[in-house]
UniProtKB/Swiss-Prot annotation:
Chain ranges passing through the membrane: none
Biased composition (Polar residues): 47-56
Entry protein name: Sperm microtubule associated protein 2
Organism of provenance: Rattus norvegicus (Rat)
First and last residues of every THEG repeat: 113-132, 179-198, 217-236, 253-272, 285-304, 321-340, 355-374
Length: 378
C-alpha cells in the first residue's frame, strides 16, 4: 500500500509540466499524440488481460475471494515498469500526456471490470440448481413426526422447520431410517398428557396409591422449623364467646368527666324527619264531602201557603179528540224499540265475495300456494 501511494505522488508530480506545455503551445502535443495513444492502448490491453485473469480465477472458485493486498502486490511491478517507460519517453520526445490522463482513462475500465465481475458472479449463482430439501443424504437433518428436512450447512442440533421454496405440490418424504432418535418422555409427562376423562374414570375410582411414585428423597426429607411453623393452622378467636364486659371497659377519667351543654345537646335524639305533606308550602284543598242533612232538607217539598191560589187545578179532564185519536204507521214504527243483534249472530265465515270467485290467479300466486313441507298421514 505504501508503494502504491508513492506511485500516485510520482504520477502527480509528472503531470505538472505537462499542464504547462499544454498552455504554452499545441504543436508538440500533436506530435506526441500518436506515440501516447499507442502506449495508452498497450496499457489498456495489459489492464484488461489482468482483469480477465482475475475474473477467470473467480469463476473457477466463486466462493474464494482474493484479498486486496495480494491484488495490489501483483499489480505493483507492472505499474513500475510502465512508469519507467513513461520517464524514458518524456526525456526523449514525449511532452503531451501525463500519467494522470492514463489513470483517468483506466478508471472506467476498472469500474467496467468490477461490474463484469459482479455480473459473472451473479450469473453463476443463478445458474446453480435449487436445492431439493426432500432428498435423503448423509447430511445434518431435522426430524419432526416422521418427516425429515435436510439442512446443507446447519450443524447444531435444533428442531427447525424448513419449508421448501419450489416443491409445494410434493409430499414430504417419511424418514424410514430413523437416524435421529426421538427424546424419551417421562412418566410424569405421559400422565399429564392424558385427557381429563381418563383421570375421572380411573384415578377417582377408590384409588389408594398415588398416580406416580414418590421418590425416596422426598419421603426422607426433614422439614425445617420454619416450615412446621407455617404449616400449623392459625387459631382464630371466637368473638361470640368473649365476655363483652371485658371489651367495653370504661376508664375512670371518662366516668368522672362532666359533659358540656353542647355535648348534652348533641346527645339528645333527633326529631323524626317531617313528612312530605308538611314540607309542601302550598296547602291543598280538602276533598269535598256532601252533607247528608242538607240533601234531606233539599229533598223535602216546599209547603204551599194557604193563601196561595194556583193558576189551574192539577187535575183536568182529557178531551174526546185525544181519546179517539188513531196512531199512524210511522208513529208505530218509531214507537217500537231497536232490535240489537249479538256479536256473531248472522255472520257466515265461509262467505266468498263474487269478485273473488271470478279472479284469475297468476303463476307467482300458484308458486306461493304450494306448501313447503307435506306431512304424510300415519
Amino acid at each position: 500500500m505504501g508503494e502504491l501511494g508513492e506511485h500516485r505522488s510520482r504520477s502527480s508530480l509528472l503531470s505538472i509540466p505537462v499542464l504547462d506545455t499544454k498552455t504554452s503551445g499545441g504543436s508538440e502535443y500533436r506530435e506526441s499524440d500518436g506515440s501516447l495513444d499507442l502506449q495508452s492502448t498497450l496499457f489498456e490491453d495489459h489492464w484488461l488481460q489482468s482483469s480477465q485473469a482475475t475474473t477467470e480465477r473467480n469463476t473457477d472458485d466463486p466462493e474464494e475471494e482474493i484479498p486486496p493486498e495480494e491484488m495490489v502486490g501483483e499489480e505493483l511491478p507492472e505499474v513500475s515498469n510502465l512508469e519507467d517507460s513513461l520517464r524514458r519517453d518524456l526525456e526523449v520526445e514525449v511532452v503531451g500526456m501525463s500519467h494522470l490522463s492514463i489513470n483517468e482513462r483506466t478508471t472506467p475500465t476498472t469500474s467496467s471490470a468490477k461490474c463484469r465481475k459482479k455480473k459473472n458472479h451473479r450469473l453463476l449463482e443463478l445458474a446453480k440448481p435449487k436445492f431439493n430439501w426432500q432428498c435423503l443424504k448423509d447430511r445434518t437433518g431435522r426430524c419432526c413426526k416422521g418427516h425429515v428436512w435436510i439442512s446443507p450447512r446447519k450443524t447444531n442440533l435444533q428442531f427447525c422447520l424448513y419449508w421448501p421454496s419450489v416443491y409445494w405440490t410434493e409430499r414430504f418424504i417419511e424418514d424410514t431410517t430413523l437416524t435421529i432418535t426421538v427424546p424419551e418422555v417421562s412418566r410424569r409427562v405421559e400422565e399429564l398428557s392424558r385427557p381429563k376423562r381418563f383421570y375421572q374414570e380411573y384415578y377417582n375410582n377408590n384409588r389408594t396409591t398415588p398416580i406416580w411414585p414418590i421418590p425416596r428423597s422426598t419421603l426422607e426429607y426433614q422439614a425445617s422449623n420454619r416450615l412446621k411453623r407455617l404449616a400449623t393452622p392459625k387459631i382464630r378467636n371466637n368473638i361470640w364467646s368473649i365476655n363483652m364486659s371485658e371489651v367495653s371497659q370504661v376508664s375512670r377519667a371518662a366516668q368522672m368527666a362532666v359533659p358540656t351543654p353542647r355535648t348534652l345537646r348533641l346527645a339528645k335524639p333527633r326529631a323524626p324527619a317531617t313528612l312530605l305533606e308538611e314540607w309542601d308550602p302550598m296547602p291543598k284543598p280538602k276533598p269535598y264531602v256532601s252533607d247528608y242533612n242538607r240533601l234531606l232538607q233539599l229533598a223535602t217539598p216546599k209547603a204551599l201557603s194557604e193563601k196561595c191560589v194556583p193558576d189551574r187545578s192539577p187535575q183536568w179532564e182529557v178531551l174526546n179528540v185525544t181519546k179517539n185519536a188513531v196512531a199512524s204507521s210511522r208513529i208505530i214504527s218509531l214507537a217500537q224499540p231497536k232490535i240489537r243483534k249479538d256479536l256473531n249472530e248472522g255472520y257466515n265465515p265461509y262467505y266468498i265475495s263474487p269478485a273473488s270467485l271470478v279472479a284469475q290467479a297468476s303463476p307467482r300466486i300458484y308458486e306461493l300456494a304450494v306448501p313447503k313441507h307435506i306431512t304424510k298421514k300415519v
